[in-house]
């Protein structure tokens, strides 16, 4: 299909233009590295340009500059120096572990997986503090998670899903590294949070969360 091929060509050029010293948000926009964007850009890169060292660089930049509690920032600036923004989004923080797991799956880079695993574990520990007694994630105040730009959007169900997805990814990391305790802990988290989503967030009539 000519249209699909044309779209693919433009998409690849767009991705290439964003691959500078980091994966930029856009060469003509704010030119920042966003963690949520990095995850998707990296997945496309593994199938196309295979500039995997650039993904590695971005992961280390995020892990190397965190809040005092260990949470990674949602984005960082590259000029005039590398510095994190004061924007912290819970879904983006959790995506650090998922992005690391994807990077390992694409590269087999065990050294980086070992080196950054503690940061991945920490993001899930921080996120786990946001759940109530029913194992449901609590809506935060202000700009606490991204999910989508829609004004007034209730992000609870989506964030519950992000937590389960990322917990599964980080559980994979723990399993690969032989960390049985962390693997079991995350397996339990996945089970409990999935059950809570089905019990409290699922609309039985529509079949949607």
Predicted regions and their residues:
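Substrate-binding groove/exosite segments of carbohydrate-active enzymes
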Residues: 1-129
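The feature captures the catalytic groove of carbohydrate-active enzymes
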Residues: 69-96, 105, 110, 127-209
């Amino acid at each position: 299909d000519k249209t699909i091929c044309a779209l693919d060509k433009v998409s690849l050029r767009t991705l290439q233009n964003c691959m500078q010293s980091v994966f930029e948000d856009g060469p003509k926009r704010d030119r920042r590295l966003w963690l949520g964007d990095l995850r998707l850009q990296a997945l496309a890169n593994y199938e196309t340009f295979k500039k995997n060292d650039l993904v590695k660089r971005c992961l280390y930049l995020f892990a190397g500059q965190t809040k005092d509690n260990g949470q990674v920032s949602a984005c960082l600036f590259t000029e005039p120096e590398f510095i994190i923004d004061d924007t912290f989004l819970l879904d983006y923080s959790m995506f650090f572990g998922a992005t690391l797991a994807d990077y390992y799956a694409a590269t087999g880079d065990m050294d980086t997986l070992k080196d950054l695993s503690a940061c991945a574990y920490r993001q899930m520990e921080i996120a786990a503090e946001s759940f109530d007694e029913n194992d449901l994630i609590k809506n935060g105040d202000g700009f606490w998670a991204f999910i989508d730009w829609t004004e007034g959007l209730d992000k609870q169900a989506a964030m519950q899903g992000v937590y389960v997805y990322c917990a599964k990814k980080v559980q994979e990391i723990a399993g690969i590294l032989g960390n049985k305790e962390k693997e079991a802990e995350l397996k339990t988290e996945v089970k409990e949070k999935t059950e809570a989503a089905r019990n409290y967030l699922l609309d039985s009539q529509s079949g949607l969360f």
